[in-house]
Amino acid sequence: MNTQTDDSAFIRACRRQPVPSVPVWYMRQAGRSLPEYRATRAGMAMLDACSHPELITEITLQPVRRYGVDAAILFSDIVLPLKAAGLDIDIRPGVGPQIDKPFRDDGDVAKLRDLEPGDVDFVSQAVGMLTAELGGTPLIGFAGGPFTLACYLVDGGPSKTFDQTRALMYGNPELWRLLLARLTAITITFLQVQVSAGASAVQLFDSWAGILSPEDYRRGVLPYSKQILAAIAASGVPSIHFGVGTGELLGLLGEAGADVVGVDWRVPLDEAVHRVAPGKALQGNLDPAVLLAPWPVIEERARDVVRKGRTAESHIFNLGHGVLPDTDPDVLARLTDLVHSVPTGSEGSAGSAGPAG
């Protein structure tokens, strides 16, 4: 836990405390949209790049230097802890995470051993290096949610609907519970390693949870998300919970226990505030594709997000998903400055402000 960042705008917003301006960071802010990222990672596989402390540190810092965002997010990948726990999984360029033999029975689940902190010592080293470099700028740790990890293991790779995963959840609930429990334990260890090394907050990405109905999410996923987020709460750092296409699940994402609920671009923030129980900050939610439009469109849409974010108890500006690879970095720099320039109007309320302009 890093107390040096407690008074930063990002951490204060996570805790629904007053801030002078809306804090900003971007999912996938360290990624293919940056020329320096492409140069740093040239010729290196993703999971290899995520295993070198110096490389993790450099890539994580790149968007902080370029954009002046209010938080860094650790450069890693959601399947990294699975690889570290001994699973033969890889990220294939242009495809995504792949496993040669998808999980179907108890024997497959038995391949997943517990994750030991020493398995990801390179992550601890990188976090230590980053917190020394970042000073008062918070570092966000992260992990994939257990449902999303299960999707890759059961379907064997990316899919739009993850039919095999849902079929397993419906048809073999005992095996499903065994798999999710194992993934939950791995995720908790991975996040605790990051927090112990100095991460100021964490984000749980359950990227594919939006393919589930609310009732299926409540039965098959929510108990495990609650367990992870309770473990993080006990460590004393704030947490963010996000998934794509989760408009119908926003209330349940909040119920899972995070301090901040991430909202994708499909649900306006002034609508999301009614779907999430009181006591939560909201994060989001500019459509990433808007950044490919002319600047007047970007400015109008960004100001609208800030305006609607004022209806929440607290708001962290972000995109509704990750930065697209062909996004112009200069546009992100300009967007960051724009959001920072809009005053909240009163430091007595994290979620109120004057006109957006």
Task: Show where each model-derived region lies.
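N-terminal basic, low-complexity leaders that serve as flexible interaction/assembly modules and, when applicable
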Residues: M1-P93, P329-E347, G357
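Exposed alpha-helical structural elements
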Residues: D6-F10, E36, D108, Q164, ...
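Short, basic, glycine/proline-bearing loop/turn elements
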Residues: R38-C50, D105-E116, G254
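Intrinsic-disorder/low-complexity, polar/charged segments
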Residues: H52, P102-D105, T161, P294
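A short acidic, glycine/proline-enriched capping/turn motif at secondary-structure boundaries
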Residues: I78-P81, G96-P97, D105-D106, P146-T148
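Short, flexible, mixed-charge acidic loops at enzyme active sites
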Residues: L87-D100, Y152-D163
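A gly/proline- and charged-residue-enriched helix-loop-helix capping module
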Residues: G94-A132
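Active-site loop segments of alpha/beta catalytic cores
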Residues: D119-G348, P355-G357
